[in-house]
A protein has these predicted regions:
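Conserved MFS/SLC helix-loop-helix module at the cytosolic interface between two early adjacent transmembrane helices
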Residues: 64-105
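Extracytoplasmic gate region of multi-pass secondary transporters
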Residues: 33-34, 230-287, 342-346, 350, ...
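C-terminal ends and interior cores of transmembrane alpha-helices
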Residues: 87-102, 310-326
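Residue-level signature of mid-helix packing/kink "hotspots" within the transmembrane helices
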Residues: 31, 59-67, 154-155, 249, ...
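Helix-loop-helix hairpin linking two adjacent transmembrane segments in secondary transporters
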Residues: 146-198
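Cytoplasmic helix-loop-helix junction between adjacent transmembrane helices
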Residues: 111-151
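A late C-terminal transmembrane helix in Major Facilitator Superfamily
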Residues: 284, 354-390
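Glycine-rich segments within core transmembrane alpha-helices of 12-TM secondary carriers
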Residues: 140-162, 280-284, 370-380
Length: 433
Protein backbone atom coordinates (compact mmCIF):
# COMPACT_ATOMS: atom_id res chain seq x y z
CA UNK A 1 0.00 0.00 0.00
CA UNK A 2 1.16 3.60 -0.52
CA UNK A 3 3.00 5.48 2.18
CA UNK A 4 0.62 7.77 4.08
CA UNK A 5 2.48 7.97 7.40
CA UNK A 6 1.76 11.16 9.39
CA UNK A 7 5.41 12.22 9.20
CA UNK A 8 5.24 12.29 5.43
CA UNK A 9 1.77 13.71 4.83
CA UNK A 10 -0.83 12.90 2.20
CA UNK A 11 -1.64 16.16 0.44
CA UNK A 12 -0.98 14.41 -2.87
CA UNK A 13 -4.23 12.52 -2.33
CA UNK A 14 -6.19 15.78 -2.36
CA UNK A 15 -4.84 16.37 -5.84
CA UNK A 16 -5.69 12.79 -6.77
CA UNK A 17 -9.24 13.31 -5.47
CA UNK A 18 -9.69 16.18 -7.94
CA UNK A 19 -8.43 13.97 -10.77
CA UNK A 20 -10.93 11.33 -9.62
CA UNK A 21 -13.72 13.91 -9.68
CA UNK A 22 -12.79 15.19 -13.15
CA UNK A 23 -12.67 11.69 -14.60
CA UNK A 24 -16.01 10.82 -13.01
CA UNK A 25 -17.60 13.88 -14.66
CA UNK A 26 -15.84 12.99 -17.91
CA UNK A 27 -17.31 9.50 -18.01
CA UNK A 28 -20.73 10.54 -16.78
CA UNK A 29 -20.89 13.05 -19.63
CA UNK A 30 -19.53 10.51 -22.11
CA UNK A 31 -21.91 7.74 -20.98
CA UNK A 32 -25.17 9.67 -21.30
CA UNK A 33 -25.69 8.95 -25.00
CA UNK A 34 -24.80 5.27 -24.58
CA UNK A 35 -27.35 4.85 -21.79
CA UNK A 36 -30.02 6.63 -23.82
CA UNK A 37 -29.07 4.93 -27.11
CA UNK A 38 -32.21 2.76 -27.51
CA UNK A 39 -34.42 5.69 -26.46
CA UNK A 40 -32.69 8.20 -28.75
CA UNK A 41 -32.85 5.79 -31.68
CA UNK A 42 -36.62 5.49 -31.29
CA UNK A 43 -37.12 9.20 -30.55
CA UNK A 44 -35.13 10.41 -33.58
CA UNK A 45 -35.62 7.35 -35.84
CA UNK A 46 -31.91 6.55 -36.13
CA UNK A 47 -30.61 3.35 -37.68
CA UNK A 48 -27.69 1.46 -36.13
CA UNK A 49 -25.50 3.03 -38.80
CA UNK A 50 -26.73 6.51 -37.76
CA UNK A 51 -25.93 5.75 -34.12
CA UNK A 52 -22.50 4.49 -35.15
CA UNK A 53 -21.93 7.79 -37.00
CA UNK A 54 -22.62 9.70 -33.77
CA UNK A 55 -20.10 7.49 -31.93
CA UNK A 56 -17.55 7.80 -34.73
CA UNK A 57 -17.79 11.61 -34.67
CA UNK A 58 -16.85 11.61 -30.99
CA UNK A 59 -13.95 9.24 -31.54
CA UNK A 60 -12.52 11.07 -34.55
CA UNK A 61 -12.44 14.27 -32.50
CA UNK A 62 -11.12 12.42 -29.45
CA UNK A 63 -8.30 10.85 -31.44
CA UNK A 64 -7.36 14.09 -33.17
CA UNK A 65 -7.60 16.02 -29.93
CA UNK A 66 -5.23 13.64 -28.19
CA UNK A 67 -2.43 14.77 -30.50
CA UNK A 68 -2.60 18.46 -29.69
CA UNK A 69 -4.22 18.34 -26.24
CA UNK A 70 -1.35 16.21 -24.94
CA UNK A 71 1.09 18.72 -26.41
CA UNK A 72 -0.82 21.65 -24.89
CA UNK A 73 -0.71 20.03 -21.46
CA UNK A 74 3.03 19.33 -21.80
CA UNK A 75 3.76 22.86 -23.03
CA UNK A 76 1.49 24.99 -20.81
CA UNK A 77 1.31 22.78 -17.76
CA UNK A 78 -1.21 20.56 -16.08
CA UNK A 79 -3.15 23.29 -14.29
CA UNK A 80 -4.14 25.36 -17.34
CA UNK A 81 -4.27 22.41 -19.74
CA UNK A 82 -6.67 20.42 -17.57
CA UNK A 83 -8.88 23.48 -17.09
CA UNK A 84 -9.09 24.12 -20.83
CA UNK A 85 -10.04 20.49 -21.42
CA UNK A 86 -12.94 20.36 -18.98
CA UNK A 87 -14.30 23.79 -19.95
CA UNK A 88 -14.37 22.73 -23.61
CA UNK A 89 -16.15 19.43 -23.03
CA UNK A 90 -18.65 21.05 -20.65
CA UNK A 91 -19.71 23.64 -23.22
CA UNK A 92 -20.26 21.06 -25.94
CA UNK A 93 -21.89 18.66 -23.50
CA UNK A 94 -24.51 21.25 -22.63
CA UNK A 95 -25.01 22.10 -26.32
CA UNK A 96 -26.55 18.63 -26.80
CA UNK A 97 -29.61 19.97 -24.98
CA UNK A 98 -30.15 22.63 -27.67
CA UNK A 99 -30.47 20.12 -30.53
CA UNK A 100 -33.86 20.05 -32.26
CA UNK A 101 -35.43 16.83 -33.64
CA UNK A 102 -35.32 18.00 -37.27
CA UNK A 103 -31.53 18.22 -37.07
CA UNK A 104 -30.96 15.49 -34.50
CA UNK A 105 -28.38 13.42 -36.38
CA UNK A 106 -26.32 16.37 -37.64
CA UNK A 107 -26.66 18.10 -34.29
CA UNK A 108 -25.48 15.12 -32.28
CA UNK A 109 -22.60 14.50 -34.67
CA UNK A 110 -21.45 18.13 -34.26
CA UNK A 111 -21.92 18.20 -30.48
CA UNK A 112 -20.15 14.85 -30.01
CA UNK A 113 -17.26 16.13 -32.11
CA UNK A 114 -16.75 19.12 -29.81
CA UNK A 115 -17.17 16.91 -26.76
CA UNK A 116 -14.48 14.57 -28.08
CA UNK A 117 -11.99 17.42 -28.50
CA UNK A 118 -12.48 18.54 -24.91
CA UNK A 119 -12.52 15.09 -23.33
CA UNK A 120 -9.32 14.07 -25.11
CA UNK A 121 -7.35 16.13 -22.61
CA UNK A 122 -8.54 14.29 -19.50
CA UNK A 123 -6.36 11.20 -19.48
CA UNK A 124 -3.10 12.84 -20.62
CA UNK A 125 -3.62 15.48 -17.92
CA UNK A 126 -4.59 12.91 -15.29
CA UNK A 127 -1.59 10.66 -15.95
CA UNK A 128 0.73 13.67 -16.01
CA UNK A 129 -0.70 14.80 -12.67
CA UNK A 130 0.04 11.37 -11.19
CA UNK A 131 3.57 11.47 -12.63
CA UNK A 132 4.12 14.89 -11.01
CA UNK A 133 2.65 14.01 -7.62
CA UNK A 134 3.57 10.35 -7.04
CA UNK A 135 6.83 8.37 -7.08
CA UNK A 136 7.09 5.51 -9.57
CA UNK A 137 6.39 2.81 -7.00
CA UNK A 138 2.98 4.38 -6.19
CA UNK A 139 1.89 5.44 -9.68
CA UNK A 140 0.06 2.26 -10.65
CA UNK A 141 -1.99 2.41 -7.44
CA UNK A 142 -2.71 6.13 -7.89
CA UNK A 143 -3.62 5.56 -11.52
CA UNK A 144 -5.90 2.73 -10.43
CA UNK A 145 -7.72 5.08 -8.07
CA UNK A 146 -8.47 7.74 -10.67
CA UNK A 147 -9.10 5.15 -13.39
CA UNK A 148 -11.73 3.59 -11.12
CA UNK A 149 -13.67 6.83 -11.47
CA UNK A 150 -14.41 5.95 -15.11
CA UNK A 151 -16.62 3.21 -13.71
CA UNK A 152 -18.14 5.58 -11.15
CA UNK A 153 -19.22 7.88 -13.97
CA UNK A 154 -20.54 4.93 -15.95
CA UNK A 155 -22.45 3.66 -12.88
CA UNK A 156 -24.00 7.04 -12.07
CA UNK A 157 -25.16 7.66 -15.64
CA UNK A 158 -27.85 4.93 -15.93
CA UNK A 159 -29.30 5.67 -12.50
CA UNK A 160 -29.41 9.46 -12.94
CA UNK A 161 -30.50 9.33 -16.57
CA UNK A 162 -33.06 6.61 -15.80
CA UNK A 163 -34.52 8.71 -12.98
CA UNK A 164 -34.83 11.80 -15.19
CA UNK A 165 -35.61 10.54 -18.69
CA UNK A 166 -38.79 8.64 -19.56
CA UNK A 167 -38.85 5.56 -21.80
CA UNK A 168 -40.33 7.65 -24.63
CA UNK A 169 -37.54 10.24 -24.29
CA UNK A 170 -39.07 13.12 -22.32
CA UNK A 171 -36.52 15.24 -20.37
CA UNK A 172 -33.58 13.81 -22.37
CA UNK A 173 -31.89 17.24 -22.37
CA UNK A 174 -31.55 17.57 -18.57
CA UNK A 175 -28.62 15.15 -17.99
CA UNK A 176 -26.49 17.10 -20.48
CA UNK A 177 -27.12 20.35 -18.58
CA UNK A 178 -26.28 18.69 -15.27
CA UNK A 179 -22.73 17.98 -16.40
CA UNK A 180 -22.11 21.69 -16.91
CA UNK A 181 -22.95 22.43 -13.28
CA UNK A 182 -20.65 19.68 -12.02
CA UNK A 183 -17.81 20.83 -14.25
CA UNK A 184 -18.09 24.43 -13.03
CA UNK A 185 -17.63 23.24 -9.45
CA UNK A 186 -14.56 21.22 -10.45
CA UNK A 187 -12.90 24.15 -12.24
CA UNK A 188 -13.30 26.32 -9.14
CA UNK A 189 -11.74 23.66 -6.89
CA UNK A 190 -8.92 22.87 -9.31
CA UNK A 191 -7.81 26.45 -9.87
CA UNK A 192 -7.77 27.06 -6.13
CA UNK A 193 -5.94 23.85 -5.22
CA UNK A 194 -3.45 22.76 -7.87
CA UNK A 195 0.19 23.79 -8.13
CA UNK A 196 3.31 21.77 -8.93
CA UNK A 197 4.70 19.95 -5.87
CA UNK A 198 7.95 21.92 -5.82
CA UNK A 199 6.14 25.24 -5.31
CA UNK A 200 2.99 24.16 -3.47
CA UNK A 201 2.76 26.06 -0.15
CA UNK A 202 0.72 23.34 1.58
CA UNK A 203 3.08 20.47 0.76
CA UNK A 204 5.50 19.44 3.49
CA UNK A 205 9.21 19.00 2.77
CA UNK A 206 8.95 15.37 3.83
CA UNK A 207 6.15 14.66 1.37
CA UNK A 208 7.96 16.50 -1.43
CA UNK A 209 11.04 14.38 -0.77
CA UNK A 210 8.90 11.24 -0.87
CA UNK A 211 7.30 12.29 -4.18
CA UNK A 212 10.76 12.87 -5.68
CA UNK A 213 12.33 9.78 -4.09
CA UNK A 214 12.57 7.83 -7.35
CA UNK A 215 11.64 10.48 -9.88
CA UNK A 216 13.77 12.44 -12.29
CA UNK A 217 13.82 16.23 -12.22
CA UNK A 218 11.64 17.84 -14.86
CA UNK A 219 12.98 20.53 -17.18
CA UNK A 220 11.01 23.27 -18.92
CA UNK A 221 11.90 21.98 -22.42
CA UNK A 222 9.24 19.82 -24.05
CA UNK A 223 9.80 16.95 -26.48
CA UNK A 224 7.92 17.36 -29.80
CA UNK A 225 5.72 14.37 -30.53
CA UNK A 226 7.36 13.89 -33.93
CA UNK A 227 10.52 12.88 -32.06
CA UNK A 228 8.54 10.33 -30.09
CA UNK A 229 7.04 8.50 -33.08
CA UNK A 230 10.22 6.59 -34.05
CA UNK A 231 10.60 5.14 -30.55
CA UNK A 232 9.40 1.55 -30.32
CA UNK A 233 8.32 2.26 -26.73
CA UNK A 234 5.73 4.72 -28.09
CA UNK A 235 4.28 1.97 -30.25
CA UNK A 236 4.36 -0.57 -27.43
CA UNK A 237 2.14 1.72 -25.36
CA UNK A 238 -0.04 2.44 -28.40
CA UNK A 239 -0.77 -1.27 -28.75
CA UNK A 240 -2.09 -1.43 -25.18
CA UNK A 241 -4.58 1.34 -26.00
CA UNK A 242 -6.05 -0.58 -28.94
CA UNK A 243 -8.14 -2.34 -26.30
CA UNK A 244 -9.81 0.98 -25.42
CA UNK A 245 -12.23 0.10 -28.20
CA UNK A 246 -13.39 -2.84 -26.08
CA UNK A 247 -14.12 -0.57 -23.13
CA UNK A 248 -16.02 1.85 -25.37
CA UNK A 249 -17.95 -1.08 -26.81
CA UNK A 250 -19.20 -1.90 -23.29
CA UNK A 251 -19.90 1.77 -22.62
CA UNK A 252 -21.61 2.85 -25.85
CA UNK A 253 -23.08 -0.40 -27.17
CA UNK A 254 -23.67 -2.25 -23.88
CA UNK A 255 -27.13 -0.81 -23.24
CA UNK A 256 -28.14 -1.59 -26.83
CA UNK A 257 -26.88 -5.17 -26.57
CA UNK A 258 -28.68 -5.81 -23.28
CA UNK A 259 -31.83 -4.19 -24.66
CA UNK A 260 -31.88 -6.22 -27.85
CA UNK A 261 -30.74 -9.49 -26.26
CA UNK A 262 -32.55 -9.36 -22.90
CA UNK A 263 -35.19 -6.56 -23.24
CA UNK A 264 -33.44 -4.23 -20.77
CA UNK A 265 -34.73 -0.63 -21.09
CA UNK A 266 -33.64 2.77 -19.75
CA UNK A 267 -35.57 2.27 -16.49
CA UNK A 268 -33.89 -1.01 -15.54
CA UNK A 269 -30.42 -0.72 -17.08
CA UNK A 270 -29.08 0.61 -13.76
CA UNK A 271 -28.52 -2.70 -11.95
CA UNK A 272 -26.74 -4.50 -14.82
CA UNK A 273 -24.47 -1.48 -15.31
CA UNK A 274 -23.90 -1.27 -11.56
CA UNK A 275 -22.67 -4.87 -11.49
CA UNK A 276 -20.48 -4.46 -14.57
CA UNK A 277 -18.83 -1.23 -13.51
CA UNK A 278 -18.42 -2.05 -9.82
CA UNK A 279 -16.52 -5.12 -10.99
CA UNK A 280 -14.55 -2.82 -13.29
CA UNK A 281 -13.73 -0.57 -10.33
CA UNK A 282 -12.51 -3.55 -8.34
CA UNK A 283 -10.32 -4.61 -11.25
CA UNK A 284 -8.87 -1.13 -11.53
CA UNK A 285 -7.93 -0.93 -7.86
CA UNK A 286 -6.65 -4.51 -7.58
CA UNK A 287 -4.62 -4.24 -10.79
CA UNK A 288 -3.05 -0.97 -9.71
CA UNK A 289 -2.24 -2.26 -6.25
CA UNK A 290 -0.96 -5.65 -7.46
CA UNK A 291 1.83 -4.42 -9.72
CA UNK A 292 2.91 -1.81 -7.16
CA UNK A 293 2.99 -4.46 -4.42
CA UNK A 294 5.11 -6.75 -6.59
CA UNK A 295 7.58 -3.92 -7.21
CA UNK A 296 7.85 -3.25 -3.48
CA UNK A 297 8.60 -6.96 -2.96
CA UNK A 298 11.61 -6.65 -5.22
CA UNK A 299 10.18 -7.52 -8.62
CA UNK A 300 11.44 -5.45 -11.54
CA UNK A 301 9.01 -2.91 -12.99
CA UNK A 302 9.14 -4.84 -16.26
CA UNK A 303 8.15 -8.16 -14.69
CA UNK A 304 5.53 -6.71 -12.33
CA UNK A 305 3.67 -4.76 -15.03
CA UNK A 306 3.68 -7.55 -17.62
CA UNK A 307 2.73 -10.40 -15.28
CA UNK A 308 -0.17 -8.30 -14.00
CA UNK A 309 -1.28 -7.60 -17.57
CA UNK A 310 -1.00 -11.31 -18.43
CA UNK A 311 -3.34 -12.20 -15.56
CA UNK A 312 -5.76 -9.53 -16.81
CA UNK A 313 -5.74 -10.98 -20.33
CA UNK A 314 -6.57 -14.44 -18.98
CA UNK A 315 -9.43 -13.12 -16.84
CA UNK A 316 -10.94 -11.40 -19.89
CA UNK A 317 -11.02 -14.51 -22.13
CA UNK A 318 -14.48 -15.83 -21.05
CA UNK A 319 -16.20 -12.71 -22.41
CA UNK A 320 -15.96 -14.35 -25.84
CA UNK A 321 -18.97 -16.57 -25.05
CA UNK A 322 -21.34 -13.78 -23.91
CA UNK A 323 -23.45 -13.73 -27.13
CA UNK A 324 -24.41 -17.40 -26.72
CA UNK A 325 -25.34 -17.13 -23.02
CA UNK A 326 -29.09 -17.46 -22.36
CA UNK A 327 -29.03 -15.96 -18.85
CA UNK A 328 -29.00 -12.17 -18.59
CA UNK A 329 -27.19 -12.19 -15.25
CA UNK A 330 -24.48 -14.65 -16.31
CA UNK A 331 -23.89 -12.48 -19.37
CA UNK A 332 -23.70 -9.38 -17.16
CA UNK A 333 -21.19 -11.05 -14.82
CA UNK A 334 -18.99 -12.20 -17.72
CA UNK A 335 -19.03 -8.68 -19.16
CA UNK A 336 -18.14 -7.49 -15.66
CA UNK A 337 -15.07 -9.74 -15.64
CA UNK A 338 -14.15 -8.37 -19.05
CA UNK A 339 -14.52 -4.81 -17.80
CA UNK A 340 -12.56 -5.58 -14.60
CA UNK A 341 -9.72 -7.16 -16.54
CA UNK A 342 -9.68 -4.26 -18.97
CA UNK A 343 -9.45 -1.63 -16.25
CA UNK A 344 -6.59 -3.45 -14.55
CA UNK A 345 -4.87 -3.85 -17.92
CA UNK A 346 -5.46 -0.20 -18.74
CA UNK A 347 -3.97 1.31 -15.60
CA UNK A 348 -0.87 -0.86 -15.92
CA UNK A 349 -0.66 0.16 -19.56
CA UNK A 350 -0.79 3.84 -18.62
CA UNK A 351 2.00 3.44 -16.09
CA UNK A 352 4.30 2.01 -18.76
CA UNK A 353 4.70 5.55 -20.09
CA UNK A 354 6.05 7.32 -16.96
CA UNK A 355 7.98 4.12 -16.17
CA UNK A 356 9.95 4.48 -19.41
CA UNK A 357 9.68 8.08 -20.66
CA UNK A 358 10.82 11.33 -18.96
CA UNK A 359 8.06 13.42 -17.39
CA UNK A 360 8.12 16.04 -20.11
CA UNK A 361 7.11 13.44 -22.71
CA UNK A 362 4.39 11.67 -20.73
CA UNK A 363 1.27 13.50 -21.91
CA UNK A 364 2.41 13.56 -25.55
CA UNK A 365 3.18 9.83 -25.63
CA UNK A 366 -0.18 9.05 -24.08
CA UNK A 367 -1.86 11.30 -26.63
CA UNK A 368 -0.17 9.53 -29.53
CA UNK A 369 -0.98 6.10 -28.16
CA UNK A 370 -4.59 6.92 -27.41
CA UNK A 371 -5.03 8.31 -30.93
CA UNK A 372 -3.97 4.96 -32.37
CA UNK A 373 -6.45 3.20 -30.10
CA UNK A 374 -9.22 5.56 -31.13
CA UNK A 375 -8.52 4.96 -34.83
CA UNK A 376 -9.05 1.23 -34.30
CA UNK A 377 -12.24 1.91 -32.30
CA UNK A 378 -13.61 4.08 -35.13
CA UNK A 379 -13.18 1.26 -37.63
CA UNK A 380 -14.85 -1.13 -35.19
CA UNK A 381 -17.86 1.20 -34.71
CA UNK A 382 -18.40 1.60 -38.45
CA UNK A 383 -18.18 -2.15 -38.98
CA UNK A 384 -20.47 -2.99 -36.06
CA UNK A 385 -23.16 -0.47 -37.02
CA UNK A 386 -23.17 -1.71 -40.62
CA UNK A 387 -23.31 -5.40 -39.67
CA UNK A 388 -26.09 -4.85 -37.11
CA UNK A 389 -28.27 -3.12 -39.72
CA UNK A 390 -27.68 -5.85 -42.30
CA UNK A 391 -27.47 -9.00 -40.18
CA UNK A 392 -29.31 -8.14 -36.95
CA UNK A 393 -27.42 -9.29 -33.85
CA UNK A 394 -24.70 -11.43 -35.47
CA UNK A 395 -22.35 -8.45 -35.24
CA UNK A 396 -22.34 -8.77 -31.48
CA UNK A 397 -20.93 -12.32 -31.74
CA UNK A 398 -17.76 -11.16 -33.48
CA UNK A 399 -17.50 -8.06 -31.29
CA UNK A 400 -17.34 -10.17 -28.13
CA UNK A 401 -14.93 -12.70 -29.67
CA UNK A 402 -12.50 -9.89 -30.47
CA UNK A 403 -13.12 -8.23 -27.10
CA UNK A 404 -12.13 -11.39 -25.25
CA UNK A 405 -9.17 -12.61 -27.28
CA UNK A 406 -7.25 -9.49 -28.31
CA UNK A 407 -5.44 -8.80 -25.02
CA UNK A 408 -3.19 -11.88 -25.09
CA UNK A 409 -2.13 -11.18 -28.67
CA UNK A 410 -1.39 -7.53 -27.92
CA UNK A 411 0.65 -8.34 -24.80
CA UNK A 412 2.87 -10.60 -26.89
CA UNK A 413 3.65 -7.75 -29.28
CA UNK A 414 4.23 -5.31 -26.39
CA UNK A 415 6.85 -7.66 -24.98
CA UNK A 416 8.55 -8.01 -28.37
CA UNK A 417 8.76 -4.22 -28.75
CA UNK A 418 9.81 -3.51 -25.17
CA UNK A 419 11.33 -6.70 -23.66
CA UNK A 420 13.24 -4.99 -20.84
CA UNK A 421 11.44 -1.64 -20.42
CA UNK A 422 14.74 0.26 -20.32
CA UNK A 423 13.99 3.89 -19.30
CA UNK A 424 14.78 6.84 -21.55
CA UNK A 425 16.43 10.13 -20.56
CA UNK A 426 15.49 13.66 -21.66
CA UNK A 427 17.24 13.05 -24.99
CA UNK A 428 15.29 9.82 -25.50
CA UNK A 429 18.44 7.77 -25.09
CA UNK A 430 18.50 4.59 -22.99
CA UNK A 431 19.57 4.90 -19.38
CA UNK A 432 21.93 2.01 -18.71
CA UNK A 433 22.16 1.00 -15.06
Amino acid sequence: MTNTAPGIGNYRYRILALVFMATTINYFDRSIVGVMAPTLQKLFDWSNKDYAAVMVSFKIAYGAGLLFMGGIIDRFGTKLGYTLSIVTWSIFGMLHAAIRPAFSLAGFIAARFGLGIGESGNFPAAVKTVAEWFPKKDRAFATGIFDASTSVGAILAPFIVGAIVTIDGKNWQIPFLLTGLLSSLWVYLWLNTYQKPAVHPKLSKAELAYINSDSEEETDEKIPWLKLLPKKETWAFSLTTVTDGVWWFYLFWGAKFLGEQFDVDIKNIGLPFLIIFVMADAGSLIGGYASGALIKRGWSINKARKITMLVCAIIILPVTIVPVIASKWIAVILIGFGAAGHQSWSINGYTLVPDVFPKKAVASVIGIGKMIGVAVAIIADIALGTVLDRANNSGYFWAFVIAGSSYLVILGFVHLLMPKMTPLDDKLEYIRK
